[in-house]
Design a protein with these regions (language model features):
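Conserved, mostly hydrophobic/aromatic
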Residues: 49, 103, 191, 195, ...
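Short helix-loop-beta junction
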Residues: 3-12, 253-255
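N-terminal pre-triad scaffold of radical SAM enzymes
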Residues: 5, 173-196, 223
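Conserved SAM/AdoMet-binding glycine-rich loop
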Residues: 57, 221-275
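Glycine-rich beta-alpha loop elements in corrinoid/cobalamin-binding modules
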Residues: 19-151
Length: 275
């Protein structure tokens, strides 16, 4: 999303991170509000502040981050001088626990709908919050609590064809060591297994594969742009990808001169082959 939305003319997306307790203590003691990583701009000076929520335990982080940024936590307490507050991610499949704090919520895949939201925000920057929310509400996957009133069922945003969706081949490369210190390509989305314990297997339905040719193309571009020596073939169950053998062989063949490593997360034992 960082790459896709920053390609929208007139729109700038910056990152921010909730601090640990010791840093938060120092920020509060020195009256330092939460700010963005790129330009060090205070969050309350942006037009929109968004949160990506993967787990329910992240909910308090949102409220604390807003408070640290000097932004009222409750939606009805925020006037025109404050940014719109939104959230997305797997935990927003059920937005009700957080709806009193958020202006709008994105439910489902974000690649397409977030770009459309960015275009609306740029085109109607001078409109009131309510006018912008009314325009955003018309998009698939967008839930605006103050406008909804139970009048319709929200249709989850789904990227139907991964091959026709722009991908972030210009992946951000950090200058410190991180846990997943490698290029990452999502080879497929969704899972056909339907294990009852797995939230992601339900949330990311239906199963959609990116073609062998497209995956190889993305990997080639990403390695050239990032300089990584390893690539992760990411999905909920990588060994269920229909052409996993051909993909691995293709990656190794095209990158033999680079000695590129291949990482395969989330493998099922019953789909392993000798090869």
């Amino acid at each position: 999303l960082y790459s896709l939305m920053n390609r929208v003319e007139g729109f700038s997306l910056e990152r921010g991170f909730a601090p640990m307790e010791d840093m938060e203590k120092l920020m509060r003691e020195n009256n330092i509000p939460m700010f963005s990583l790129e330009s060090k701009t205070p969050l309350k000076e942006f037009d929109v502040v968004g949160f990506s929520l993967s787990y329910e335990m992240c909910y308090p982080n949102v409220l604390n981050a807003l408070d640290l940024a000097g932004i009222p936590v409750r939606r009805e307490e925020r006037g025109e001088e404050y940014p719109l507050i939104m959230a997305g991610g797997t935990c927003m499949m059920n937005p009700v626990p957080m709806e009193r704090f958020l202006d709008f919520i994105v439910i489902g895949d974000g690649e397409e709908v977030m770009v459309e939201i960015a275009k609306i925000l740029v085109a109607y920057k001078d409109k009131t919050k309510m006018e912008r929310l009314q325009l955003i509400e018309g998009l698939d996957g967008v839930y605006v609590p103050v406008l909804h009133k139970g009048k319709k069922r929200i249709k989850r945003a789904i990227v139907a064809d991964l091959n026709n969706t722009e991908y972030y081949e210009d992946q951000i490369v950090p200058y410190i060591n991180i846990v997943h210190d490698r290029a990452t390509v999502e080879i497929q989305r969704g899972c056909s297994r339907g294990c009852r314990f797995c939230q992601a297997g339900i949330v990311y339905r239906p199963v959609r594969e990116r073609s062998l040719e497209k995956n190889l193309e993305l990997i080639e571009k990403m390695i050239k742009k990032t300089g990584y020596g390893e690539v992760s073939l990411s999905s909920l169950s990588s060994s269920d990808y229909s052409k996993i053998d051909e993909l691995i062989k293709g990656v190794k063949s095209k990158n033999a001169h680079r000695n590129l490593g291949v990482s395969l997360p989330s493998l099922r034992m019953n789909t392993h082959s000798v090869e």
